[in-house]
Amino acid sequence: MTNTRKNHPLMKIMNNSLIDLPAPSNISSWWNFGSLLGACLTLQIITGLFLAMHYTADTTTAFSSVTHICRDVNYGWIIRYLHANGASMFFLCLFIHIGRGLYYGSFTLLETWNVGIILLFTVMATAFMGYVLPWGQMSFWGATVITNLLSAIPYIGINLVEWIWGGFSVDKATXTRFFAFHLILPFIIMAXVMVHLLFLHETGSNXPLGTPSDSDKIPFHPYYTIKDXLGLLLLXLLAMTLVLFSXDLLXDPNNYMPANPLNTPPHIKPEWYFLFAXAILRSIPNKLGGVLALFFSILILAIIPLLHTAKQQSMIFRPLSQYLFWILIANLFTLTWIGGQPVEHPYIVIGQTASILYFSLILIIMPLVNLIENKMLKW
């Protein structure tokens, strides 16, 4: 009798990706976040679909339609808050997933890493456009400020911004196109996730030791399916606690005021997951310089494989690199805190110092320390 799971053209792909996949026997809970990201993406697409059924992409009715979802639609409030806080869960998992890749040297799987960077940019673009849709004060002014950054591009900047706006300011055309993009991008993300997994399964997963694990593999199911299901349970617990007890904890109160082009909020800031980038952007007094720093603060991930000068892949046996890695994480926390503060005396200097340290650690200090550790292997 033929085994359908192993022979059916469609089931064979699923089987080789999720059931009979040979996986390293020692991957820790830090490897759970890939599946959690998949769960977050699924949640966002499902809740987003239901929200799109009731939302109207028009400046006059967008704010009211979101209010209508929360008040009149059956369980609309939970769908809306699952979607809003689901984005926070998504980015939390995303940052941990990238941090894991940096710590354990997963960036040596070049294709997987590069597709991951493209995914990060796409998810960030999607989240930004989603934040604009409720058409509250912070939505409107966030859209104005961020799109305006493109005007720093020499020669074509102003034309580019007006082309994106669909007019001379953020208006009805902007809301409509942002909704269209926000709707289509998650499906593009899904396609890129398939490519990400395709490249990952070509090489196999990295392991905490950073050594080849071909000699010691175990089937993905049941060992890692049960482990992933536990991670999912904990994520669901965190998400539901957030949604049901303090749904607005991570949001901005200004977004409960309808957009008013005549009244600028005292402090325009993005959601928490973009604050580190906002702090880097603000720390440079020049507009073009700030935009470039913002862009390269994320694109810098692409050159990390080139800066990897260590003889060992993982940081597990490199105490100095570990120390610098945790300084980098603390620095990112500092940048996130600074991004949420007003632009005044102590915060400006702290932000500039943290921004310089961020780039210095990645570009100069860590590669040098890697070389020192290589020398230490001979002592």
UniProtKB/Swiss-Prot annotation:
GO molecular function: metal ion binding; ubiquinol-cytochrome-c reductase activity
Its job: Component of the ubiquinol-cytochrome c reductase complex (complex III or cytochrome b-c1 complex) that is part of the mitochondrial respiratory chain. The b-c1 complex mediates electron transfer from ubiquinol to cytochrome c. Contributes to the generation of a proton gradient across the mitochondrial membrane that is then used for ATP synthesis.
Residues holding heme b b562: H83, H182
Cofactor note: Binds 2 heme b groups non-covalently.
Binding site for heme b b566: H97, H196
A GO BP annotation: mitochondrial electron transport, ubiquinol to cytochrome c
Topological type in the membrane: Multi-pass membrane protein
CDD domains, A to Z: cytochrome_b_C, Cytochrome_b_N
Keywords of this entry: Electron transport, Heme, Iron, Membrane, Metal-binding, Mitochondrion, Mitochondrion inner membrane, Respiratory chain, Transmembrane, Transmembrane helix, Transport, Ubiquinone
Pfam families cross-referenced by the UniProt entry: Cytochrom_B_C, Cytochrome_B
Entry annotated with the keyword Signal: no
Cellular localization per UniProt: Mitochondrion inner membrane
Cofactors: heme b
Name assigned to this protein: Cytochrome b
Transmembrane segments: 33-53, 77-98, 113-133, 178-198, 226-246, 288-308, 320-340, 347-367
Other comment: Heme 1 (or BL or b562) is low-potential and absorbs at about 562 nm, and heme 2 (or BH or b566) is high-potential and absorbs at about 566 nm.
Subunit structure comment from the entry: The cytochrome bc1 complex contains 11 subunits: 3 respiratory subunits (MT-CYB, CYC1 and UQCRFS1), 2 core proteins (UQCRC1 and UQCRC2) and 6 low-molecular weight proteins (UQCRH/QCR6, UQCRB/QCR7, UQCRQ/QCR8, UQCR10/QCR9, UQCR11/QCR10 and a cleavage product of UQCRFS1). This cytochrome bc1 complex then forms a dimer.
One cellular component (GO) term of this entry: mitochondrial inner membrane
Similarity comment text for this entry: Belongs to the cytochrome b family.
Gene3D superfamilies: Cytochrome Bc1 Complex, Chain C
Gene: MT-CYB
Coiled coil: none
